[in-house]
Amino acid sequence: MEAIAKHNFARISPQKARLVADLIRGKSVDQALEILTFSNKKAAVLVKKVLESAIANAEHNEGADIDDLNVAKIFVDEGPTMKRIMPRAKGRADRILKRSSHITVVVADR
């Protein structure tokens, strides 16, 4: 049985979020939560909330035992990019890309 949780339009670059996602892929949920708790990356906070939501979904919807769950799948897709302008010298302007992500976590029995 699987339980899914998503965070769409998370305000973090997909490249940075994938670094954290790679740390917990395939791990047990206890181990994954421990890794995310002590990680000092901004993405770790967002991924941890999604993982906790997936665990709660598994427990509530499927009646799963938390001790038997592991991170079956985790992936970070690219969301829409907000384009912003930064004024520069001599009337020029640079574009700033504020990237967003769609974080998906799937937990399943071992």
Curated annotation (Swiss-Prot):
The keyword Translocase does not apply. Gene3D superfamilies: Ribosomal protein L22/L17. Keywords: Ribonucleoprotein, Ribosomal protein, RNA-binding, rRNA-binding. One of its GO terms (cellular component) is cytosolic large ribosomal subunit. It comes from the Bacteria. HAMAP family: Ribosomal_uL22_B. This is Large ribosomal subunit protein uL22. It comes from Vibrio campbellii (strain ATCC BAA-1116). The gene is rplV.
